[in-house]
Amino acid sequence: KKHFEKYLGGAGAICRHLSSFVNKTNLLSYLGQNNDELKFIKSNLGKKIIFDFISKKDSPTIIKERFVEEINNRKIFGAYSLNDSSVSSLEEKKLEKKLSKFLKKSNLVIVSDYGHGLISKNFAKKIISKKKFVAVNVQINSSNIGYHSLQNYRNANCIIINENELRYEMRSKTEKIENLLKLLSKNLNLQFLIVTRGYSGAILYDAKVKKFYYSDAFANKVVDKVGAGDAMLSILAICLYKKIDCDLSLLISSLCASQSVNSIGNKKAISKTTLLKELEHYLAWWNEYL
């Protein structure tokens, strides 16, 4: 029996998560040279999301297919349609022009860099240089491992990665994770560095005050982990930008991640109503416990 579902991923999914929490979101990315999938993308972005794209020559719009075993939703294999070569210098200039236009009316920049050729080292530096609050997710995946690095994002305000990505970046299998967070924060001149650890929760390190914050994993049931990091980054970036207490910021974003893993892929955006109910329930329990 075959069943097919299709969702927005990556930056599109992040924008959908943000929609319930901000007045307006700008989305900048690239499509294939024939603008394939544009109709689908438009139909799945809400009215609060203003989008602009460049067309990448000799490339399709990125599609990632996962073939999943029906009973327990276990991934059997994946097939990617993409051209991960770098955008041309002309295409990058178009990106820079569009970015400058968006940034005039923006307070917060969220960069989701999946290593598929959109963001060069030079372009990453220009994003950081705009003096906005910049939060970054640099994902290591099967198509970019060995080539993708956090080093392009020196001086960003916030970076979120998972533990495997942290250990890969630092070339360390056994070092205490807190030591790695301190060292990487220093190397990249970051204030906030967050590492997610699956069932072990998440750790936030604030280099400014040299303090660690910890959160448990709140998901009772994990249907699919895809997109959990993006969901967490979306809301955590807002919280840290608004200078919400780090403990509370990490708690809120961890609850968002737990929402994300309860559905397949990026099928559902973070629900603000559900989040507030869960937060109220947790804080009530915590006050009673104390």
Show which residues each predicted segment covers.
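A generic structural signal for short hydrophobic patches within well-formed alpha-helices
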Residues: 166-167, 275
